[in-house]
Amino acid sequence: MLKKSSLASVVTIAGTDPCGGAGIQADIKAISATGAYPASVITVLVAQNTCHVTAIQEIPLCFIQQQIDAVFSDLAIGAVKLGMLYQEEIIHLLVNNLKKYQPPFIVLDPVMITQTGHLLLKPQAINALVNDLFPLAALITPNIPEAETILKSPINDFNSLRDAAITLAKQYKISVLLKGGHLKSVDSPDI
């Protein structure tokens, strides 16, 4: 038992990826690589591989709540990383719990769509994500399609990438790491 130990614990709250390239599995690897202790709360089960998503299975909200309570009641949480949240009800549940448990640092990756076009956030949940969850985060890490969706503006080159990062930071009063991997250029700059 790590009951409120001094070991830095980072909880990732997200969906799964059975191939380990994204989601909870990738977050656990990244957190472990920093020397922190990874914990997780699964929001949705995703059947996917490196090519496509075949199915998404929702998890009952009461079970997500039980996972949150189990982790936060036992570990000293130094940070929370939010990923695939899928629906508005999960976002509202998290907003209430983040206000209750008040973790010192929240990173939000506003996962919305796969590279193959499969929706990972229901469209009606975007407003809740932006209006209710952004204000609680210290850092957001959108990719280009996510930033375009949030800003309703295209990002075509490095200058528009930079401008989008600045606009997001100013508009939401938040730190931004805008991932440039979708930019059609020789390099893929992050800002």
Kindly give the residue locations of the regions a language model identified:
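Conserved N-terminal subdomain of the carbohydrate kinase-like
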Residues: L2-T12, S32-Q115
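Glycine/serine-rich anion-binding loops at beta->alpha junctions
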Residues: I13-S32
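Glycine- and other small-residue-rich loops at beta-strand/loop junctions that grip anionic moieties
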Residues: T16, L82-G83, H118, K179
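Short glycine-enriched, charge-decorated loop/helix-capping segments at active-site entrances
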Residues: H52-I59, H118-P123, K152-N156
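Rossmann-like NAD(P)(H) cofactor-binding subdomain of soluble oxidoreductases
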Residues: D109-L121, A125, L129
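Conserved phosphate/ATP/ADP-binding segment of small-molecule kinases
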Residues: P123-I191
